[in-house]
A protein has these predicted regions:
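Transmembrane alpha-helical segments and their cytosolic interface motifs
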Residues: 162-192
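Residue-level signature of catalytic and energy-coupling elements of molecular machines
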Residues: 19, 57, 120, 173
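Membrane-spanning helices that line or support transport/gating and their immediate boundary helices
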Residues: 15-18, 62, 66, 115-127, ...
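Structural signature of hydrophobic alpha-helical transmembrane segments
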Residues: 15-27
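Short, hydrophobic transmembrane alpha-helix segments
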Residues: 8-18, 36-42
Length: 221
């Protein structure tokens, strides 16, 4: 739904800045809650929140791409101050070094973080499902031995089922995040190539100026 809303609507820079700030704040809150959670079931909504935040960020990517391609010829701040600030931090005073650093960060994000976390989620889900029959048998054995009552047995069964559902949801969410990372890389190339084409052919910019504007905006995005 957020993507469908983002396609026809062209966000002004100030609104895009506010939306990006909300997205960053929301992501930091999720990270802090996850770090300070002792039991996974205490934060069982994490896969759903991860999916929602990824969809929201993808919608913002679409909106920022539209703004970059349509207003990028106006300069570095054409897509708002948030994108410009991030680009300035990465690029510094040297666009070549900034571009190399940006490519390294993209590779680390996709190859190391995204693929690694996806593999971890997949293995965790597999081991949890494989261990499910053994845990059920252990609960039945404790119940038959009189170590626990029927109510405690039901609570334990409910807990292990919830854990299995959580890890299964995390496996699915990690695949969605991996797709989002691939989409982000494609959007990056679209911003650069499309920006150069729009800037040079439609807006009358020279190639070096167009490359400077649209490359910095893409890095910030």
């Amino acid at each position: 739904l957020s993507l469908h809303v983002a396609f026809p609507i062209s966000l002004p820079p100030i609104l895009l800045d506010m939306s990006l700030t909300m997205s960053i704040t929301f992501s930091l809150l999720i990270l802090l809650v996850a770090l300070y959670t002792n039991e996974i079931l205490d934060f069982s909504v994490f896969p759903s929140l991860l999916l929602i935040s990824t969809l929201f960020r993808l919608a913002l990517n679409v909106a920022s791409t539209r703004l970059i391609l349509s207003e990028g010829h106006n300069g570095h701040a054409a897509a708002g101050q948030v994108i410009n600030s991030f680009a300035s931090i990465v690029v510094g005073n040297n666009y070549a070094i900034g571009l190399v650093v940006f490519v390294i960060l993209v590779v680390i994000n996709f190859v190391v973080i995204t693929k690694g976390s996806g593999r971890i989620a997949e293995v965790a889900a597999r081991f949890t499902l494989d261990a499910l029959p053994g845990k059920q048998m252990s609960i039945d054995a404790d119940l038959n031995a009189g170590l626990i009552n029927e109510e405690q047995a039901r609570a334990r069964r409910k807990k292990i089922e919830a854990e299995a559902d959580f890890y299964g949801s995390m496996d699915g969410a990690s695949k969605f995040v991996r797709g989002d990372a691939i989409a982000g890389i494609l959007i990056m190339f679209i911003n650069v190539v499309g920006g150069l084409a729009v800037g040079v052919l439609q807006k009358g910019l020279d190639l070096s100026t167009a490359a400077e504007y649209y490359t910095q905006l893409t890095i910030g995005d």
